[in-house]
């Protein structure tokens, strides 16, 4: 089985994020092996692959959410602005200020719609006045294409919104603190088709200002929204455990129409497994 990776996408500009010879462990278990990739700025990059291949694990490494797991450790580097985000003197809270996350299930805070957006802005000291806070809240909700639906009920609970609206509220909350990168871990997995379309349209709008990395099991979704796609696979070892690795990373059209690797072709054509 293929264990090397094919990076046919080449970029000359400075990437938004890059992984260099990255391996991830939980205790003695190796979850990901030797990942190297450069994520371009202001593009949508999709991670696809079977369950258990490490897509979400890698995504969470990009803003150090895996630090919350005691047995997690990492070899290699993740570079943001040419600095390894895992250097000992780097504050993970500051990293998360610049690299935001939207999770699979909508998770609004138990607060009003207004305070869902304002919370991170307050914590980071990004608004100097009530007027400035109001502007940030409105701008963020407009960016999430939610303003017209909620502008007359900003004092209501975020839980009063529909599932699709809640997810757009979470996206608005993520962009309110003006991150460079927004990570999305299957953001449409729990949404109905109509809400999914709205979130995909939103992602297409947000790429103008943000770098977006999205994990998705929906390959049609990847073809609709992603500029680039990375295909990950998993290999079983003697213990029966499986480690993930990057098979191929290229422009989305190439991955789906002219992949270099047979494993990629088998997966995107439905012959996988």
From Swiss-Prot:
Enzyme class: translocase
Keywords (A to Z) from UniProt: ATP-binding, Cell inner membrane, Cell membrane, Membrane, Nucleotide-binding, Phosphate transport, Translocase, Transport
EC number: 7.3.2.1
Alphabetized SMART domains for the sequence: AAA
Subcellular location: Cell inner membrane
Residues annotated to bind ATP: 49-56
CC annotations in GO: plasma membrane
Classification via InterPro entries: AAA+_ATPase, ABC_transporter-like_ATP-bd, ABC_transporter-like_CS, P-loop_NTPase, PstB-like
Ranges where the ABC transporter domain occurs: 17-259
Reactions it catalyzes: phosphate(out) + ATP + H2O = ADP + 2 phosphate(in) + H(+)
Membrane-related topology note: Peripheral membrane protein
A GO term for molecular function: ATP binding
CDD domains registered for this protein in UniProt: ABC_PstB_phosphate_transporter
One of the GO BP terms on file: phosphate ion transmembrane transport
NCBIfam families given in the database record: 3a0107s01c2
Record text on subunit structure and interactions: The complex is composed of two ATP-binding proteins (PstB), two transmembrane proteins (PstC and PstA) and a solute-binding protein (PstS).
Family, per entry: Belongs to the ABC transporter superfamily. Phosphate importer (TC 3.A.1.7) family.
Physiological role: Part of the ABC transporter complex PstSACB involved in phosphate import. Responsible for energy coupling to the transport system.
Protein name: Phosphate import ATP-binding protein PstB
Gene: pstB
